[in-house]
């Protein structure tokens, strides 16, 4: 029997109390109501938990130990019950109240594809600029410069887990994910608002910590994750090799990848 829940929205959070209500409310106001919200809080020290507990519809998971972005998303994935998974960072939000309906309509009209590529608006200061992500084949998707997991809506049964406690976990997961995707369609209008104004974003804080002295060991772990990745499709394997060559060259030259 098909799962009653259609979308699982997974949100990792760490100390994002300033933006969290906007992120949550952008989901709760959706006209399409068949979804679940899973927030994985990664040991926040602000009032994030207090904010989250005000909302009855949210499934809150509190990490006992730091899991970082990759680990938090994996925890959420293990609890997800929807047919499709959407990722959202806790300082970003959905563009308008019709986003879920647009994604759902695209899925139904295209015979339930494995993946839906989501375009977005980039917010810097008070200005939003539209970023179109037309990626209608796995070959185009895997070679995309922008690999953020929140730019893809994926069938739950095909979701690949993220490397944990490492740099560039989105990249490794992206390649592994593309290797499992056969059908993909794109939505050429904004679905997500990517907020570039948050100086306390999880990814930015993790990058700052790496720059303080842990970048080299994280680069080695990133390279190891790429080496361990096994790809069935040649286009994914070629992209894996290219990414690996870049990181190995940067390690050799002492360069930090951001």
Residue ranges and their predicted role:
Residues 98-129:
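Conserved donor NDP-sugar-binding/catalytic core segment of glycosyltransferases
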Residues 63-80:
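Glycine-rich, basic loop-to-helix element that forms the pyrophosphate-binding segment
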Residues 85:
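Short aromatic/hydrophobic "clamp" motif used to bind/position activated sugar donors
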Residues 135-209:
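Conserved nucleotide-sugar donor-binding catalytic segment
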Residues 19-21, 46-54:
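Acidic helix N-cap motif at the loop->helix transition within catalytic regions
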Residues 26, 33, 41-50, 65, ...:
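A conserved acidic beta->alpha catalytic loop
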Residues 1, 148, 179, 186, ...:
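C-terminal subregions of glycosyltransferases and related glycan-biosynthesis enzymes
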Residues 15-29:
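Short, well-formed alpha-helical segments that are part of the catalytic scaffolds
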